[in-house]
């Protein structure tokens, strides 16, 4: 990659050189296909200008799926077809999350802290898990959260709204690794993680992942995806990763798709509800329901109001929502929520 440090892998190359002395063949392996920074991968060699990784053999996800040693994932990215951002008296409208983010009117972190957005994504993830459990009753779900506070809120949301069990594991827990080991053989439905369940964790019954991390590097995204790819007992086990249609995550998903076998895709829109987003702290949005649609009006107020349910919109953010169902999708699916 361009800008790769010329000194970052000197110790690795020295080690390979020492091992190679007197040996006709030397095999060096790496599970790291690239790094997001400029650091070279240890024990690997680079050539060319700009410096690129030298490989004699590459075994990717597509190979693993075709060899039936990994599950074939569904990558489901949830989007919005009608986003309204109100700044004081001016309203900006966008037809996608990408458009709103690129216009610098919406931040990815806004989606990760907005209760209604999280509720809709988690509801979709829950429905995916229910669908998979029709044939695989021990399947479980993973939520990769962006903060400890968010993780606790999501865990409570799962317990309260889905009547399912949930456990939180985070980097600040003394017994986090023990809790992960217990989860592997338990009947707990969901595990919500902050900086714990990523690289190297082996929990084959995980078949659904809700990606709600603030980290948007391709290596981390693929590492998280790997948590739901591990074959359990059967080779026909489905798995799904659900995330917001943030530009970088779309790019990574499309790259993963290029390596996967082709398959069919079906999308069905079940329901549409309209929300607005306002950034004016002196106003709040109030909703009314008519014929299964939510209509919005903005009312001046000197007080702050917070709502928790879908039909009482939180003041800080809201946007168009559709409930969608995608079955047997093995290609990246960008759905309008």
Task: Place the predicted regions along the sequence by residue.
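A short beta-strand-to-loop transition that corresponds to the Sensor-1 phosphate-sensing loop
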Residues: 29-33, 147, 194-196, 245-246
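Switch/connector loops and helix/strand junctions flanking conserved nucleotide-binding motifs
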Residues: 4-6, 35-40, 73, 84-86, ...
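SF2 helicase catalytic motif II
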Residues: 1-28, 32
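Conserved catalytic network of the ASCE P-loop NTPase/AAA+ motor domain
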Residues: 17-23, 67, 133-136, 162, ...
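Conserved RecA-like P-loop NTPase helicase motor core
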Residues: 165, 170-270
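Conserved helicase/translocase motor-coupling segment
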Residues: 94-182, 335-336
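Interdomain helical connector at the RecA1-RecA2 junction of SF1/SF2 helicase-like NTPases
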Residues: 38-138
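Long, largely alpha-helical accessory region at the distal end of helicase-like NTP-driven motors
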Residues: 111-113, 117-124, 128, 248-337
